[in-house]
């Protein structure tokens, strides 16, 4: 480092908020690449995904947490525990609130928990997302109400999808992190095994394709990852569903749904990995997968956190 060079900074930034608040979209926008899956359905993110972004001399490790909601199942409870665990471990917490939904009961519950868990050593900021959906006077009132409920260090108006305000937020985060060496190599954009990213990409395609409750009752695991001599990779994945009827829906007429999902997932994996991908999907019925520790381990969740 030269005498006049800025000191390096590094730290964790946890993005928290209700389901579908835009946390995964913001993570991807900050990193400049897709590391979290994004769909129009709520509760898509299940585990804590870490995306790594550079801002000048700062390395920002974004922790995209599952949405905070009232849990009903073991999986729900483990997801919420992972979200608050990510927040507790972070140097900076960013609460994301959807501008058009405003001060919901869910947001109030999160604010209440933030006040209960207040840590003087931790910075908490507010990011009001999707600002293009509301009028300025509505936005001003929401900003005042949220800041009256919690003493945020800073408030940002953003649209993660359209990129409004994202650069300003990233610059502030980089400047606010503690001085210290970088935690990851300069070219690393995620702290997630490739096997998990591959499974998440396939689950995203399933979630976009399927309807109602089925996306929440399935999981995808990468069973085999084989590097081939020609530079390509063979990926074998299993989709676990809870009922025979679910398997039929997922396969579709003459296997058309499964083929379409496989094609879409393979195309994105090729783009992500930069090489040829041979993707093979199997669908298996496993009625109690939601109660199996192995499934939670594969998703990066703590099975014990799901205890009632």
Swiss-Prot record:
HAMAP family per UniProt: GTPase_Era (MF_00367)
Annotated stretches, region: G1: 17-24
Region (G5): 158-160
GO molecular function, one term: small ribosomal subunit rRNA binding
GO biological process: ribosomal small subunit assembly
Location within or outside the cell: Cytoplasm; Cell inner membrane
UniProt xrefs under Pfam families: KH_2 (PF07650), MMR_HSR1 (PF01926)
Name assigned to this protein: GTPase Era
Lipid bilayer topology: Peripheral membrane protein
Family matches, as Gene3D superfamilies: 3.30.300.20, P-loop containing nucleotide triphosphate hydrolases (3.40.50.300)
Region described as G3: spans on this chain: 64-67
Residues given in the record as GTP binding sites: 17-24, 64-68, 129-132
Organism of origin: Dinoroseobacter shibae (strain DSM 16493 / NCIMB 14021 / DFL 12)
């Amino acid at each position: 480092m030269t005498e006049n060079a800025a000191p390096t900074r590094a730290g964790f930034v946890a993005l928290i908020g209700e389901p579908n608040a835009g946390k995964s979209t913001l993570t991807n926008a900050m990193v400049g690449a897709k590391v979290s899956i994004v769909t129009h359905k709520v509760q898509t993110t299940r585990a804590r995904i870490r995306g790594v972004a550079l801002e000048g001399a700062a390395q920002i490790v974004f922790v995209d947490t599952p949405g905070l909601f009232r849990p009903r199942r073991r999986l729900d409870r483990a997801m919420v525990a992972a979200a608050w665990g990510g927040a507790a471990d972070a140097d900076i917490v960013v609460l994301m609130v959807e501008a058009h939904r405003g001060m919901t009961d869910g947001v109030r519950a999160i604010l209440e928990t933030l006040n209960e868990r207040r840590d003087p050593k931790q910075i908490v900021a507010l990011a009001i997302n999707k600002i293009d959906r509301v009028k300025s006077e509505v936005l001003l009132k929401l900003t005042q109400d949220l800041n009256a409920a919690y003493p945020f260090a800073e408030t940002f108006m953003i649209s993660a999808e359209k990129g409004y305000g994202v650069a300003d937020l990233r610059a502030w985060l980089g400047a606010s992190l503690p001085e210290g060496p970088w935690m990851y190599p300069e070219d690393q954009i995620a702290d997630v095994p490739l096997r998990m990213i591959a499974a998440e990409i396939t689950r995203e395609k399933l979630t976009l394709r399927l309807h109602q409750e089925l996306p929440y009752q399935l999981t995808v695991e990468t069973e085999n990852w084989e590097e081939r001599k020609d530079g390509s990779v063979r990926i074998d994945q299993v989709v676990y569903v809870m009922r025979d009827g679910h398997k039929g829906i997922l396969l579709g007429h003459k296997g058309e749904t499964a083929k379409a999902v496989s094609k879409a997932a393979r195309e994105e994996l090729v783009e992500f990995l930069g090489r040829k991908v041979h993707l093979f999907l199997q669908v298996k019925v496993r009625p109690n997968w939601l109660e199996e520790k192995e499934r939670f381990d594969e998703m990066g969740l703590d099975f014990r956190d799901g205890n009632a």
